[in-house]
Amino acid sequence: MTTAVGASQQLDEVGDRRGTGTEFANEIFAVVDVLNRESGLRRAVSDTGSETKARQGLIDAVFTSKVSPDCKELLDATTTCKWRSPAALTRALERQGVRAVLRGARQADRFEAVADELFHVSRLVRGQAALQVALGDPNRSVADRQELLMKLVGGQVSEETLVLARRAVVASDSTFEQVIDGYLHVAAEMADRRRAIVTTAKALTDAQRAEMVKQLERITGSPIELSEVVDPTVLGGALINLGDEVIDSTVAHRLDQARRELG
C-alpha cells in the first residue's frame, strides 16, 4: 500500500495518464463535493484500516454509473493509498481536478496565460476588502458568490481560469486568495519551478528582475517564476513570498522593527 507521502504522487501519475481539461476537472470536483457532503462515505473510502477490496467495492457501488471510466480509474487508485485523514483524500482529489485544468491549458498553449490570470484575479480580490468579505461570506450561497466573481472577471479571462476561480469560491476552510495561491503552486510544480511573489514600491527594471531571479535560483536551487506586485506602502526594498517562506527587506519592515526596538 502506498504511504501518505507517495499518495499524491501516485494520483498525479494516474491523472496524467487519464483525462484532461475542464470537463474532466469538473467531474472530479463533483466527486469531491459528494465526499465532503457525505462524511460517512468519505470516512469509509479513506479508512486504511479496511481492506482495499471493501473500499473498492464501495466506490464501485456509489460512483461506477455516475462518472467516466477515466474518473473511475482515478478513484480506484485512491484505495491503494494510505490517507492520514478523510480530508487528505479529498484534498488529493481536488488537486487532481486542478491539474486536469492546467494540463488542458498546456495542451492549448495557454498554461502561462492561465497562471498569470490566476495571479491577477487573486491580486484583484486582495485589493478589495469588501470583495474579500463577500466571497468568503458563509451566509451567501456558493452560486451567489460565484456569480459575483463572474461579474468581475467573466469574459476577461480564459475558460480554464474561470473554472478554477469558480472552484476557489467553494472552499470553506481557506480564503479565496489562499486557494488561488495553492493553484499557482500546483502550476509551478507542473512547470518544474517555484513561484516567487515580489512586492516593491515601484516596478522592477529588466536588470533588477533578472538579478532577483538569479539570486533566488541560487538560494533555492530551483528555476524561479517571478510574479510582481507594486505597493508604494513598502517604501523601498522588497518583500518576497516563496511558498511558505517570506523574505522581508522592505523599508517599511525595517522602520517597524526600529519602532519596536525603541519601545
Curated annotation (Swiss-Prot):
Cellular component GO terms, alphabetical: plasma membrane; proton-transporting ATP synthase complex
Record keywords, A-Z: ATP synthesis, Cell membrane, CF(1), Hydrogen ion transport, Ion transport, Membrane, Transport
Membrane topology value: Peripheral membrane protein
PROSITE patterns: ATPASE_DELTA
Main location group: membrane
Superkingdom of the organism of origin: Bacteria
InterPro entries: ATPase_OSCP/d_CS, ATPase_OSCP/dsu
Subcellular location: Cell membrane
GO molecular function: proton-transporting ATP synthase activity, rotational mechanism
Physiological role: F(1)F(0) ATP synthase produces ATP from ADP in the presence of a proton or sodium gradient. F-type ATPases consist of two structural domains, F(1) containing the extramembraneous catalytic core and F(0) containing the membrane proton channel, linked together by a central stalk and a peripheral stalk. During catalysis, ATP synthesis in the catalytic domain of F(1) is coupled via a rotary mechanism of the central stalk subunits to proton translocation.
Similarity section: Belongs to the ATPase delta chain family.
Subunit comment: F-type ATPases have 2 components, F(1) - the catalytic core - and F(0) - the membrane proton channel. F(1) has five subunits: alpha(3), beta(3), gamma(1), delta(1), epsilon(1). F(0) has three main subunits: a(1), b(2) and c(10-14). The alpha and beta chains form an alternating ring which encloses part of the gamma chain. F(1) is attached to F(0) by a central stalk formed by the gamma and epsilon chains, while a peripheral stalk is formed by the delta and b chains.
Name this protein carries in UniProt: ATP synthase subunit delta
Source species: Cutibacterium acnes (strain DSM 16379 / KPA171202)
